[in-house]
Amino acid sequence: MSQLPVVLGAGLNTGDIIFQLIAMLILLALLKKFALKPLLGIMKQREDYIGNEISSAEQKHVQAEKLLEEQRVLLKEAREESHTLIENAKKIGEKQKEEIIQAARQESERLKDSARTEIVKEKEQAVAALREQVASLSVLIASKVIERELDEQAQEKLIQEYLKEAGESR
Protein backbone atom coordinates (compact mmCIF):
# COMPACT_ATOMS: atom_id res chain seq x y z
CA MET A 1 0.00 0.00 0.00
CA SER A 2 2.78 2.31 0.49
CA GLN A 3 3.73 1.98 -3.12
CA LEU A 4 0.38 3.09 -4.43
CA PRO A 5 0.81 6.82 -3.84
CA VAL A 6 4.20 6.72 -5.47
CA VAL A 7 2.86 4.98 -8.56
CA LEU A 8 0.07 7.48 -8.91
CA GLY A 9 2.37 10.42 -8.46
CA ALA A 10 4.89 9.05 -10.92
CA GLY A 11 2.33 8.58 -13.70
CA LEU A 12 1.05 12.15 -13.66
CA ASN A 13 2.72 14.57 -15.92
CA THR A 14 1.93 18.22 -15.23
CA GLY A 15 2.77 19.24 -18.78
CA ASP A 16 0.14 16.89 -20.17
CA ILE A 17 -2.42 18.19 -17.70
CA ILE A 18 -1.70 21.79 -18.65
CA PHE A 19 -1.81 20.90 -22.35
CA GLN A 20 -5.12 19.09 -21.94
CA LEU A 21 -6.45 21.97 -19.87
CA ILE A 22 -5.45 24.52 -22.56
CA ALA A 23 -6.87 22.30 -25.31
CA MET A 24 -10.09 22.01 -23.35
CA LEU A 25 -10.28 25.79 -22.87
CA ILE A 26 -9.61 26.38 -26.59
CA LEU A 27 -12.27 23.79 -27.45
CA LEU A 28 -14.73 25.49 -25.07
CA ALA A 29 -13.92 28.91 -26.58
CA LEU A 30 -14.43 27.56 -30.11
CA LEU A 31 -17.65 25.82 -29.11
CA LYS A 32 -18.86 29.00 -27.44
CA LYS A 33 -18.03 31.10 -30.48
CA PHE A 34 -19.16 28.77 -33.25
CA ALA A 35 -21.79 26.55 -31.64
CA LEU A 36 -23.14 28.12 -28.48
CA LYS A 37 -23.70 31.67 -29.84
CA PRO A 38 -25.61 30.47 -32.94
CA LEU A 39 -27.49 27.95 -30.81
CA LEU A 40 -28.39 30.63 -28.28
CA GLY A 41 -29.34 32.95 -31.16
CA ILE A 42 -31.61 30.30 -32.64
CA MET A 43 -33.10 29.63 -29.21
CA LYS A 44 -33.64 33.38 -28.71
CA GLN A 45 -35.30 33.63 -32.14
CA ARG A 46 -37.47 30.65 -31.30
CA GLU A 47 -38.36 32.18 -27.93
CA ASP A 48 -39.23 35.51 -29.63
CA TYR A 49 -41.26 33.69 -32.29
CA ILE A 50 -43.20 31.71 -29.68
CA GLY A 51 -43.71 34.89 -27.63
CA ASN A 52 -45.01 36.71 -30.72
CA GLU A 53 -47.29 33.80 -31.57
CA ILE A 54 -48.67 33.73 -28.02
CA SER A 55 -49.15 37.51 -28.11
CA SER A 56 -50.80 37.29 -31.53
CA ALA A 57 -53.04 34.46 -30.33
CA GLU A 58 -54.03 36.49 -27.27
CA GLN A 59 -54.81 39.52 -29.46
CA LYS A 60 -56.84 37.36 -31.82
CA HIS A 61 -58.66 35.86 -28.85
CA VAL A 62 -59.43 39.36 -27.53
CA GLN A 63 -60.59 40.42 -31.01
CA ALA A 64 -62.71 37.28 -31.30
CA GLU A 65 -64.29 37.97 -27.91
CA LYS A 66 -64.92 41.57 -28.96
CA LEU A 67 -66.47 40.47 -32.27
CA LEU A 68 -68.55 37.86 -30.46
CA GLU A 69 -69.87 40.50 -28.09
CA GLU A 70 -70.59 42.85 -31.00
CA GLN A 71 -72.44 40.05 -32.78
CA ARG A 72 -74.45 39.34 -29.64
CA VAL A 73 -75.37 43.02 -29.38
CA LEU A 74 -76.28 43.17 -33.07
CA LEU A 75 -78.34 40.00 -32.77
CA LYS A 76 -80.15 41.39 -29.74
CA GLU A 77 -80.83 44.65 -31.59
CA ALA A 78 -82.04 42.74 -34.65
CA ARG A 79 -84.39 40.67 -32.49
CA GLU A 80 -85.73 43.78 -30.80
CA GLU A 81 -86.15 45.52 -34.14
CA SER A 82 -87.92 42.53 -35.66
CA HIS A 83 -90.18 42.33 -32.61
CA THR A 84 -90.95 46.04 -32.97
CA LEU A 85 -91.62 45.63 -36.70
CA ILE A 86 -93.94 42.69 -36.05
CA GLU A 87 -95.83 44.63 -33.39
CA ASN A 88 -96.12 47.65 -35.69
CA ALA A 89 -97.31 45.44 -38.54
CA LYS A 90 -99.94 43.90 -36.25
CA LYS A 91 -101.11 47.36 -35.17
CA ILE A 92 -101.22 48.59 -38.77
CA GLY A 93 -103.08 45.42 -39.79
CA GLU A 94 -105.64 45.91 -37.02
CA LYS A 95 -106.05 49.57 -37.96
CA GLN A 96 -106.52 48.70 -41.64
CA LYS A 97 -108.97 45.96 -40.68
CA GLU A 98 -111.03 48.45 -38.68
CA GLU A 99 -110.87 50.99 -41.52
CA ILE A 100 -112.00 48.38 -44.05
CA ILE A 101 -114.85 47.27 -41.78
CA GLN A 102 -115.88 50.89 -41.22
CA ALA A 103 -115.73 51.63 -44.96
CA ALA A 104 -117.79 48.50 -45.68
CA ARG A 105 -120.39 49.56 -43.11
CA GLN A 106 -120.56 53.05 -44.59
CA GLU A 107 -120.89 51.63 -48.10
CA SER A 108 -123.59 49.24 -46.87
CA GLU A 109 -125.51 52.12 -45.28
CA ARG A 110 -125.10 54.19 -48.43
CA LEU A 111 -126.40 51.31 -50.56
CA LYS A 112 -129.34 50.78 -48.18
CA ASP A 113 -130.20 54.49 -48.29
CA SER A 114 -129.87 54.50 -52.06
CA ALA A 115 -132.10 51.42 -52.33
CA ARG A 116 -134.69 52.97 -50.01
CA THR A 117 -134.66 56.18 -52.03
CA GLU A 118 -135.01 54.18 -55.25
CA ILE A 119 -137.89 52.14 -53.77
CA VAL A 120 -139.70 55.29 -52.64
CA LYS A 121 -139.15 56.88 -56.05
CA GLU A 122 -140.42 53.81 -57.91
CA LYS A 123 -143.39 53.55 -55.54
CA GLU A 124 -144.27 57.18 -56.19
CA GLN A 125 -143.94 56.59 -59.94
CA ALA A 126 -146.14 53.48 -59.70
CA VAL A 127 -148.76 55.37 -57.67
CA ALA A 128 -148.67 58.24 -60.17
CA ALA A 129 -149.04 55.81 -63.07
CA LEU A 130 -151.89 54.05 -61.27
CA ARG A 131 -153.60 57.39 -60.66
CA GLU A 132 -153.27 58.24 -64.33
CA GLN A 133 -154.77 54.90 -65.29
CA VAL A 134 -157.58 55.29 -62.77
CA ALA A 135 -158.25 58.81 -64.01
CA SER A 136 -158.27 57.74 -67.65
CA LEU A 137 -160.46 54.75 -66.81
CA SER A 138 -162.81 56.98 -64.86
CA VAL A 139 -163.07 59.35 -67.80
CA LEU A 140 -163.59 56.42 -70.14
CA ILE A 141 -166.26 54.92 -67.88
CA ALA A 142 -167.98 58.25 -67.54
CA SER A 143 -167.98 58.77 -71.27
CA LYS A 144 -169.33 55.28 -71.87
CA VAL A 145 -172.03 55.81 -69.26
CA ILE A 146 -173.07 59.04 -70.83
CA GLU A 147 -173.09 57.51 -74.29
CA ARG A 148 -175.29 54.66 -73.38
CA GLU A 149 -177.60 56.32 -70.98
CA LEU A 150 -178.12 53.10 -69.28
CA ASP A 151 -180.16 52.29 -66.30
CA GLU A 152 -178.55 51.93 -62.91
CA GLN A 153 -177.92 48.20 -63.10
CA ALA A 154 -176.30 48.45 -66.50
CA GLN A 155 -174.11 51.31 -65.28
CA GLU A 156 -173.02 49.26 -62.27
CA LYS A 157 -172.26 46.28 -64.48
CA LEU A 158 -170.27 48.46 -66.88
CA ILE A 159 -168.21 50.00 -64.03
CA GLN A 160 -167.43 46.55 -62.64
CA GLU A 161 -166.31 45.35 -66.07
CA TYR A 162 -163.99 48.30 -66.53
CA LEU A 163 -162.56 47.93 -63.04
CA LYS A 164 -162.00 44.26 -63.72
CA GLU A 165 -160.39 45.12 -67.04
CA ALA A 166 -158.19 47.75 -65.37
CA GLY A 167 -157.12 45.23 -62.71
CA GLU A 168 -156.09 42.69 -65.38
CA SER A 169 -154.11 45.22 -67.40
CA ARG A 170 -151.82 45.98 -64.46
UniProtKB/Swiss-Prot annotation:
Molecular function GO terms recorded: proton-transporting ATP synthase activity, rotational mechanism; proton-transporting ATPase activity, rotational mechanism
Membrane-topology descriptor: Single-pass membrane protein
Signal sequence annotation: none
Record's keyword annotation contains Glycosyltransferase: no
Keyword Transmembrane helix: yes
Main location (coarse class): membrane
Function per UniProt: F(1)F(0) ATP synthase produces ATP from ADP in the presence of a proton or sodium gradient. F-type ATPases consist of two structural domains, F(1) containing the extramembraneous catalytic core and F(0) containing the membrane proton channel, linked together by a central stalk and a peripheral stalk. During catalysis, ATP synthesis in the catalytic domain of F(1) is coupled via a rotary mechanism of the central stalk subunits to proton translocation.
Family: Belongs to the ATPase B chain family.
The protein's name: ATP synthase subunit b
